[in-house]
């Protein structure tokens, strides 16, 4: 039988970077980590971008990191999944999108595309509009109208005109589509039940009511001239020969191409719910309505283009199915990460899964208490190791991330030192019972606290690699280079002498 327990230790926000300036990880006094990295198998792992299912070059985050670790496979985020489907051609065979096209052909009606027109990548991506336009062209659909919601929050405040110009150039190139209306996201993408705002966007879409302009760009420029930027552009209709270019009518098809649900729900309900009381809508305009993702299961009369796959056979589930006992330990700030996210978005604990929560300190900002609750978390970990009750323990130390977010270098250094002191105590306890441990991080943060270009404080996550260290395992094992977070569960499973389930597509990092 393998060593027991097997501990997965996650040092949240503990990235690795060569430069020492603004690098709390390098500036901190960390003799324990230095010794572990020198004496045990150690490699750098990837925790950002495509390696964790995010767009290339995008910094990792805690939710995505823990999801990938617990799943033992790369979990593609909506943005990446849709972009990938366009690139590999699956997009053009999407059932919901094809049904929307069929409806238009059958009724000789129009296809309306609506959503946030930018490359912000938070709610939508402009390249996805190009994908739908290309699909419409291939399907021989001529009446295609885009209703542009302007961003200015995830993009510069007056960049909307430029995005619409890019879109119009692309429509010309593909040979289909024209802009029919424009609205600031303040109106079209409200999420606080301010129905008076949503009503303005809806009336422009369906009734052609509101301000008018002879072209989308002219209307946006007129708004800029009045010092009203993208987010707040009052909904306007683009006219042709004095009338609205196009409005959404009975038997038309509508594709809402936002992939993030929270700000797409209200407008979708306005189109889809039979009984609607947000404002005086009148009868529902019956359309074939496609949401890019599932905005809300309770919304009626709609289809979903990209359905979220449920993540089966996560590491926690696998342990439970094999009758093994596991503990999850974290302080409040990262408790959801080692439970809900690590379990693939499932709230209920697995059979034999104990959860140990330590309260995070109540301070305004964590630079005021950089050690946070690390010592208490460490005590719980040492207790769990010594109890010999658990086959697997998953533990998260929040400090490098939470204190890193404050951008206060002195505090971040203290945070790193506190955590590394805890690592030392855990290693001692582990050796006493002859257990084994894999140390890693979910993404970087504390190793970069200064923006290299501006010299200003840098408080975000990073794209830097993270440490992978194998402690007190079979000395015949080494770790391979080039691994990512999805490879961790398969590694632990091999360490425990078990067979990796088929659903896990990550690859063990162990080499003999």
What label would you give each PLM region?
Residues 1-512:
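Feature captures the catalytic ectodomains and active-site-proximal regions of enzymes
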């Amino acid at each position: 039988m393998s060593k027991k327990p097997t501990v997965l230790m996650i040092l949240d926000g503990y990235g690795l970077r060569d430069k020492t300036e603004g690098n709390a990880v390098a500036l901190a006094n960390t003799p324990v980590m230095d010794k572990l990295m020198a004496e045990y198998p150690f490699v750098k792992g990837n925790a950002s971008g495509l390696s964790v299912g995010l767009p290339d070059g995008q910094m990792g985050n805690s939710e995505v990191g823990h999801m990938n670790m617990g799943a033992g496979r790369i979990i593609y985020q909506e943005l990446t999944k849709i972009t990938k489907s366009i690139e590999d051609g699956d997009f053009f065979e999407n059932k919901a999108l094809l049904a929307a096209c069929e409806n238009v052909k059958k009724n000789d009606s129009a296809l309306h595309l609506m959503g946030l027109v930018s490359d912000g990548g938070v709610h939508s991506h402009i390249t996805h509009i190009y994908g739908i336009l290309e699909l419409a062209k291939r399907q021989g659909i001529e009446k295609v109208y885009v209703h542009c919601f302007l961003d200015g929050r995830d993009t510069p405040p007056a960049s909307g005109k430029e995005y619409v110009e890019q879109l119009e150039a692309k429509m010309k190139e593909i040979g289909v589509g024209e802009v029919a209306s424009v609205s600031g996201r303040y109106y079209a993408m409200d999420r606080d039940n301010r129905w008076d705002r949503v009503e303005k966007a809806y009336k422009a879409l369906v009734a052609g009511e509101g301000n008018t302009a002879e072209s989308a760009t002219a209307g946006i420029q007129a708004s800029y001239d009045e010092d009203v930027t993208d987010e707040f552009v009052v909904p306007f209709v683009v006219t042709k020969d004095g009338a609205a270019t196009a409005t959404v009518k009975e038997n038309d098809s509508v594709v809402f191409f936002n992939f993030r649900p929270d700000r797409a729900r209200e407008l979708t309900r306005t189109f889809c719910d039979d009984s609607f009381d947000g404002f005086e809508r009148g009868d529902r305009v019956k359309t074939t309505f496609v949401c890019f993702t599932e905005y809300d299961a309770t919304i009626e009369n709609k289809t979903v283009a990209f359905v979220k796959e449920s993540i089966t056979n996560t590491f926690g589930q696998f342990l439970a199915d094999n009758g093994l006992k596991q503990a999850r330990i974290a302080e409040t700030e990262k408790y959801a990460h080692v439970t809900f996210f690590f379990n693939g978005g499932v709230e209920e604990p697995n059979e034999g899964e104990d959860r140990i929560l330590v309260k995070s300190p109540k301070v305004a900002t964590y630079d005021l208490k950089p050690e946070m609750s690390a010592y208490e978390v460490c005590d719980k970990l040492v207790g769990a190791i010594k109890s010999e009750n658990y086959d697997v323990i998953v533990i998260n130390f929040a400090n490098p991330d939470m204190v890193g977010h404050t951008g206060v270098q002195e505090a971040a250094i203290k945070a790193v030192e506190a955590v590394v002191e805890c690592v030392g105590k855990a290693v001692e306890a582990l050796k006493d019972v002859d257990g084994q441990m894999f140390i890693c991080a979910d993404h970087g943060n504390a190793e970069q606290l200064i923006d290299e270009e501006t010299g200003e404080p840098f408080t975000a996550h990073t794209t830097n690699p993270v440490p992978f260290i194998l402690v007190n395992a079979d000395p015949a094992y080494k770790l391979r280079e080039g691994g990512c977070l999805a490879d961790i569960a398969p590694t632990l499973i091999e360490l425990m002498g078990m067979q990796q389930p088929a659903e896990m597509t990550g690859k063990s990092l162990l080499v003999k």
